[in-house]
Structures are given as structure tokens and as C-alpha cells.
Amino acid sequence: MFEKQANAQDPAFSQFYANPLYLNPAFAGATPKGCPRASLNYRDQWPGIGRTYVTTSASYDQHIDAIGGGVGILVQNDRSGNGNYNTTHASLLYSYHLEINRKFALKAGFEASFRSLSLDWNNLTFGDMIHPQYGFIYPTQENQNNPDVQNKIFPDFSTGFIGYSENFFFGFAAHHLT
């Protein structure tokens, strides 16, 4: 038996093929040779409830023959609950292209990111703030002044590979390796 600490989940894009660098770092430069690709994505989850989850991302990648693969950049922001919890990350990606034969190739990719997490305590509600009869009358006992809880900036790494031909592709990605 083993255990591993789990962290909050990443945003999920329903049209994941429209954001290939977010899906797998091996997709960096997976375009016709020399052809650049730019992508902009916007997601507003559950807009009818008021405090939505809004995610935006922008990416650029291109295959470069001189380095034997592709490079890319990905910037993403995820804002939850009217900005109470905000996650931003910026990534640089590289993928190596290996042509097995004329009909099949492999790409191995690596992503290095800096991630920023912030939490706005002023707009959060905790159970210890609510009186059963009078509503919100108490201050919270939660630790709001701890900078380790409010803001974090840290590096993060991901890796992946894809194999592809004219008719199919397959792949695997491992994110948040730190």
C-alpha cells in the first residue's frame, strides 16, 4: 500500500484538441514543418450560477528543423469564484521529433512552468462565521495572514510522448511532476 498527496484538479477543456499544448507537451511543433500555430481558448463554466469558473489560455508553437523538433509557449489563467482563487502558469515547451519510417513518427516532449496560486480570503465564507439564527455575524478563525496560504509561486514540470501516422495517433502525458 502507498500514499501520495493529491492537489486540486486542473481545468478541463471539452474541446481539448483546440488546446494541444495544454493536453500534451509532445504536441509542441506537431504542425507541418515550419508552420506556426497559435491558439486562444476561453472557458466559462456554469455562467448561470453567478460565481463562475473562468479559464483563458494562449499558446504558440512551431517546428524548427535546426533543433530537430518543436518549441512552444503556453500561458493560462484560471479564476474561480469571482477571483477568490486564481491560478496562473506560464510554460516553455520542447519536443523532439523522431521519424521511424515514412509513415510513422514519435515525438517526446517536455514542459517547464512557473505557477502562481493566490487566494483572496476577504470574499470567502466559513462555517464558523455563521450564527444559526442571525446569519453572518462572526469573524472567521481561519489563518488569513499566513503568506504560505495566500500566495504561492513554484516551478512545475510535465512530460509526454505521441506516436502518429497519417491515420491515427496515440500518446501519454504526465503533468505536475514536482
Residue ranges and their predicted role:
Residues 2-8:
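Sec/Tat signal peptide C-region and signal peptidase I cleavage site
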Residues 9-178:
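Subset of outer-membrane beta-barrel
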